[in-house]
């Protein structure tokens, strides 16, 4: 919703809806950006025993400029070792309808992401984007991987 309000405002031609879109966009944040930038919270008291990596979702990174905030939060989770994923900012291959229109290309992109995740020897891969989590989690499950897939909110809720 926030991304839509932020990026699609120019397509709203009436002043009333445009004002409402701006008002919504001003109060809508990606979770880690809200915690770190707005609330100045870097430690929520979470605990997760294991090695964790972060996948940068294309929209979060490129559209919203969210990169360091989730890493900061993860690094403050007790008993967690953060491992930077090789090419963490590379697409997972989902891209909305991209994976349907170009399934072979999508699968090849995902193969590279999965190889990077498996190579870094983590217990969990975390992201802030549900479609990335479904794409990555689906493949990890199909290959029988023990790597857990988690949304950032799920990791931060661990105690």
Which ranges hold each PLM region?
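Iron-sulfur cluster-binding electron-transfer modules in prokaryotic oxidoreductases
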Residues: 1-159
């Amino acid at each position: 919703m926030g991304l839509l309000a932020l990026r699609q405002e120019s397509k709203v031609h009436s002043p009333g809806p445009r004002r409402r879109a701006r008002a919504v966009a001003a109060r809508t944040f990606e979770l880690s950006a809200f915690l770190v930038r707005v609330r100045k919270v870097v430690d929520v008291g979470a605990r997760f025993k294991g090695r964790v990596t972060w996948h940068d979702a294309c929209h979060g990174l490129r559209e919203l400029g969210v990169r360091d905030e989730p890493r900061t939060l993860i690094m403050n989770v007790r008993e967690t070792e953060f491992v930077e994923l090789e090419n963490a900012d590379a697409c997972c291959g989902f891209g909305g309808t991209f994976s349907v229109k170009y399934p072979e290309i999508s699968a090849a992109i995902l193969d590279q992401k999965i190889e990077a995740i498996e190579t870094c020897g983590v217990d969990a891969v975390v992201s802030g984007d549900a479609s990335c989590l479904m794409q990555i989690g689906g493949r990890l499950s199909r290959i029988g991987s023990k790597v857990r897939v988690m949304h950032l909110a799920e990791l931060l809720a661990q105690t």
